[in-house]
A protein has these predicted regions:
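N-terminal binding-site loop/beta-alpha segment at the start of enzyme catalytic domains
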Residues: 1-92, 319-320
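Active-site mouth loops of central-metabolism enzymes
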Residues: 23-38, 104-115, 139-140, 144-145
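A short acidic, helix-capping loop that chelates divalent metal ions and anchors anionic groups
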Residues: 24-29, 61-65, 101-107, 228-231, ...
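Short, acidic/polar
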Residues: 33-47, 112-127, 176-177
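Acidic (Asp/Glu)-rich catalytic clusters
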Residues: 49, 78-93, 125-129, 158, ...
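A structural motif
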Residues: 52, 130-133, 163
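Active-site groove signature of glycoside hydrolases
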Residues: 125-143
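Beta/alpha (TIM)-barrel catalytic core signal, keyed to glycine-rich beta->alpha loops juxtaposed to Asp/Glu
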Residues: 141-320
Length: 320
C-alpha cells in the first residue's frame, strides 16, 4: 500500500510511523500483550503491510529492568519475519534510542559517557539484528554532564560508523540549535530528527518545530495522542472537537488527531503506539483526510489554553 511520504534525513518514509513501546508492556494496563508475542508481531506486520516504513523503539522499552532491550528484539524479529521483499525491508527505518539506564529494583538514570553509549549502541544493533543502526537518537540528556561533552560523545558514534544517522530526543530549541552547530544539518550528515512530546494535550514545542522547519529536520512527536493512559480522552471532554470533526469526515477522533498533527508542520511524522491491528489501521486513516482551514481553526480554538509542559525542558512558547 502506498502512503504519503515525508523526509527523514536521506530517506523518504511514511508520513506516520509506528511507536512500538506499548508492545513491551511499559504500562501496567498493557500486560496482556506479553502473553501474546505473536499478536505483538502481527501489529508490526500489519503496519508494514499497510506501507509504514518507520518503526520507533528504544533500548529501555521493556516490561522490567531485567528484560532490557525487549522491544528492540521484538522489532528486529518482526522485520526479519515480515513477508515483504528484501527491497521493501531495506526501505524500513528502525529508529532506536539510548542514553537512559535501567537497573536492579527498577533504578533509572542517565549516562552519556562515551563508554556507556558505545556499549549501548553495539547492544542495540545486536538485538535489532543489524550491522549498523539506521537512526539512533540520544534519548535524554545526562544532567551530570556538560552539554557539549555529551553531544561530542553522540557524534563519536557517528564518526565510528556504528550508526548511519543521529537524532535527538527531549531537547529544547536552544539545545537543538547547539547540537546543529556542533554536528551539522541533515544535508551535512548531522541531526536529522527530534523526538519530543507533542499532542493535542501537550503543545509547548513551537520553537522546536520552527528550528526543524528551518533546517529540514523531522519532528517525531512521542505520545501524539496524549500517552498510553490518556489516549482514550481524545474525542471527549475538552478534546471533544476531535470527535465532532471526525464524525463529519467519517473517521475516528484518533484519526482526526493524526490529521491535525500532520497539518501542524511539514516536518511532523507522528509515531502513535498500538497493541491492536485495528488501532494501526484506524490511525492510518488520518493520512487519507485533509482538514480544511476552518476545521483546523475549530480544533485549535477548542484546545485548553494551559498545555502541560515536560518539566525537564526549558520553558517554551505555546502552540503557534
Amino acid at each position: 500500500m502506498s502512503l504519503p511520504q515525508r523526509v527523514l534525513g536521506p530517506w523518504e518514509v511514511s508520513a506516520m510511523g509506528l511507536g512500538c513501546m506499548p508492545l513491551s508492556a511499559m504500562s501496567a494496563n498493557r500486560l496482556e500483550i506479553l502473553n501474546d508475542p505473536e499478536g505483538a508481531v502481527a501489529v508490526i506486520h500489519s503496519a508494514l503491510d499497510s506501507g509504514v516504513t518507520l518503526l520507533d523503539t528504544a533500548d529501555i522499552y521493556a516490561p522490567s529492568w531485567d528484560a532490557f532491550g525487549h522491544n528492540e528484539r521484538l522489532v528486529g524479529a518482526a522485520l526479519a519475519t515480515w513477508s515483504g521483499s528484501a527491497e521493501a525491508k531495506d526501505k524500513v527505518v528502525i529508529a532506536t534510542k539510548g542514553g537512559i539506564t535501567r537497573g536492579p529494583k527498577e533504578s533509572w538514570g542517565r549516562s552519556s559517557h562515551l563508554d556507556y553509549l558505545l556499549r549501548a549502541v553495539e547492544a542495540s544493533a545486536l538485538r535489532l539484528g543489524v550491522d549498523r543502526i539506521k537512526l539512533w537518537q540520544h534519548h535524554r540528556l545526562d544532567p551530570s554532564m556538560v552539554f557539549e561533552d555529551q553531544f561530542e560523545n553522540v557524534l563519536a558514534l557517528l564518526e565510528r560508523g556504528l550508526i548511519e544517522r543521529i537524532g535527538v530526543s527531549n531537547y529544547s530549541a536552544k539545545q537543538l540549535r547547539r547540537a546543529i552547530q556542533m554536528g551539522g544539518t541533515p544535508d551535512q550528515g548531522g541531526v536529522i530528527s527530534v523526538q519530543n512530546q507533542f499532542s493535542p494535550r501537550y503543545r509547548n514545542d513551537a520553537d522546536v518545530m520552527d528550528v526543524c522547519e528551518e533546517f529540514g529536520i523531522a519532528y517525531l512527536p512521542w505520545s501524539p495522542l496524549g500517552g498510553i493512559s490518556r489516549a482514550e480522552g481524545i474525542g471527549t471532554g475538552e478534546f471533544g472537537a476531535f470527535a465532532e470533526v471526525g464524525a463529519t469526515l467519517g473517521v475516528s477522533a484518533y484519526a482526526t488527531a493524526i490529521a491535525w498533527l500532520i497539518q501542524t508542520s511539514p516536518t511532523v511524522i507522528p509515531i502513535p503506539g498500538a497493541t491492536k491491528v485495528s488501532s494501526v489501521r484506524d490511525s492510518l486513516t488520518g493520512l487519507s483526510i485533509a482538514l480544511t482551514d476552518e476545521q483546523v481553526s475549530l480544533l485549535n480554538s477548542s484546545l485548553p489554553e494551559d498545555a502541560p509542559l515536560d518539566g525537564e525542558l526549558e520553558e517554551q512558547p505555546a502552540f503557534r
